[in-house]
Design a protein with these regions (language model features):
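Beta1-alpha1 glycine-rich phosphate/pyrophosphate-binding loop at the start
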Residues: 2-76, 164-185
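Phosphate-coordination loops involved in phosphoryl transfer and adenosine-cofactor binding
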Residues: 5-7, 81, 145-148, 208
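Rossmann-like NAD(P)H-binding beta-loop-alpha module
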Residues: 138-186
C-alpha cells in the first residue's frame, strides 16, 4: 500500500539516476528523495571511461563530485555502497538485507552489466571489464607499468578503448568473432574505414576467431585463439557487450524482456515502479546511449512531480569516440526495409540507409563526412515521436 509520505527511491547513481534527481529537484523542491547505490555514489559521466587514458585521467579525476557532494547540492539522501536485495511491490518496500525501506514511487535506474566471457584458463583475475568508475580504477591499478593490452570485442566499447589506450601508450590487439568492427552498428564500408584508422595508430586486429583460453604467462597472459594463433599480453579487457540488469526485477515479479518493460510513461508492470536508462525497455526499445536517458529523465521527473508525461525520442545520433577515425551513426530500426547507399573517399564514408521511396531511415558517417550530420538529421524520422 502506498505511503504518500515515503520518499521517491531511486536505485542507481549513474547518469540515469542522478540526471533524474537533478530534473525532479527542479520541479519538486521539497520532495524527499533517496538514492540507493551499490557503488560509492560518485557522480561521473560513464562515456568518459573510454577517454581516460588519452587524457591521462585517474578515476578520481574523472569523478565530478562525491556522494556527499550530491546529497548536499540536491538535498537528497544517498545510501552508497548499499545493495537492494529484494523489492516488495505490494508493500511498496525495498529491502537492504533485513532493513526495509518504504517508497512512494520507485525508480529502477541500475543500468546494464558487462557480459562475462566464457573462456577457459587460469588468468581470470587478469581479465577486466570496465563498466563503471570502480572498474576503471581497478584496471588502471592492474595496468600500471604494463604495455600490452588484449581487448576482446570489436564493437563500440572495444574500439573506443583500443583508440584511447593506444593514444595512452599501450600496444593494443583486438580479437572478435566478426567480419568487421562495429558488426551491429555500422555497414561494412564505414566499419572498414574505422578499422583502417585504428590500424593507422597501431591497433592490431584479429577478426573472425574467438578467444578460447587465457592462461597465466609470467606476469602477463597468453591467449589462445580458435584459429590457432597465440596472443601475448599483460592484461585483458573484455568488451564483448552489455546487457540490462534484470535479476531484482524478475524476483519482484516485474515484467522483463530484453530490458525492464516500460510504457511511455516509463512505468513498469508494477504500480508506482518506473525505470529508465540502460536497464529499461521502452515500447520495445533498449537504447544504451546517453541522449535517450536524458529525454527519459526529463519526462519521468514531470511524471513524478505530478504531471504524467510520456517520453519521446527524437533523432538521436551516436557519436563514437574513435578520434583515429571519427564516427557518427544513426542506425536504422532493426525492422526497417531498405538498403545502404555509400559514397566514399578513403576513410571518409557517407552511408545512407534509404527505403524504396528514397526516404532516409539511418546513416553512418566517418572521417570528414561527420560534418554532414546536421543536414542528415533533418531528414530522419524521430525514433519515437
Amino acid at each position: 500500500m502506498t505511503n504518500s509520505t515515503a520518499p521517491v527511491v531511486v536505485i542507481g547513481s549513474g547518469l540515469a539516476g542522478y540526471n533524474l534527481v537533478k530534473e525532479l529537484r527542479k520541479l519538486a523542491p521539497e520532495q524527499d528523495i533517496l538514492v540507493i547505490t551499490a557503488d560509492d555514489g560518485r557522480n561521473y559521466s560513464k562515456p568518459m571511461l573510454s577517454t581516460g587514458y588519452g587524457k591521462n585521467k585517474s578515476a578520481d579525476e574523472l569523478a565530478m563530485s562525491s556522494a556527499a557532494d550530491m546529497a548536499a547540492q540536491f538535498n537528497i539522501t544517498v545510501r552508497n555502497n548499499t545493495r537492494v536485495t529484494h523489492i516488495d511491490t505490494d508493500a511498496h518496500r525495498v529491502f537492504l538485507g533485513e532493513e526495509p525501506v518504504e517508497y512512494s514511487k520507485l525508480v529502477l535506474a541500475w543500468g546494464a552489466e558487462a557480459v562475462s566471457p566464457r573462456i577457459e584458463g587460469d588468468a581470470e583475475d587478469r581479465i577486466f571489464s570496465i563498466n563503471d568508475l570502480e572498474d576503471y580504477a581497478a584496471f588502471r591499478a592492474a595496468a600500471d607499468g604494463k604495455k600490452r593490452v588484449l581487448i576482446m570485442g570489436a564493437g563500440l566499447i572495444g574500439c573506443e578503448f583500443a583508440n584511447d589506450m593506444t593514444v595512452g601508450g599501450f600496444e593494443c590487439e583486438v580479437v572478435a568473432p566478426c567480419d568487421h568492427v562495429f558488426p551491429t552498428l555500422l555497414p561494412q564500408d564505414a566499419a572498414n574505414a574505422v578499422q583502417r584508422g585504428l590500424e593507422g595508430i597501431g591497433v592490431k586486429f584479429h577478426l573472425g576467431p574467438l578467444v578460447t583460453r587465457v592462461s597465466r604467462d609470467g606476469d602477463g597472459v597468453s591467449a589462445a585463439l580458435s584459429n590457432g594463433v597465440e596472443v601475448k599480453a599483460d592484461v585483458v579487457v573484455s568488451a564483448i557487450g552489455l546487457r540490462p540488469r534484470l535479476d531484482l526485477a524478475v524476483k519482484a515479479g516485474i515484467q522483463v524482456n530484453q530490458g525492464i518493460v516500460a510504457d511511455r510513461l516509463l512505468q513498469t508492470s508494477a504500480k508506482d515502479v518506473y525505470t529508465l536508462g540502460d536497464c529499461a525497455e521502452v515500447e520495445g526499445r533498449v537504447l544504451l546511449y546517453v541522449l535517450p536517458l536524458m529525454s527519459a529523465a526529463r519526462a519521468l521527473a514531470k511524471t513524478l512531480a505530478g504531471t504524467p508525461t510520456e517520453v519521446s525520442y527524437g533523432v538521436m545520433p551516436v557519436t563514437v569516440k574513435t578520434p583515429a577515425c571519427p564516427v557518427v551513426v544513426n542506425p536504422p530500426a532493426a525492422d526497417a526495409a531498405g538498403r545502404w547507399i555509400v559514397e566514399q573517399e578513403g576513410n571518409d564514408v557517407q552511408a545512407e540507409y534509404r527505403n524504396e521511396a528514397g526516404d532516409l531511415l539511418g546513416f553512418a558517417l566517418t572521417g570528414a563526412k561527420v560534418a554532414n550530420k546536421v543536414a542528415l538529421n533533418k531528414e530522419l524520422p524521430a525514433i519515437m515521436p
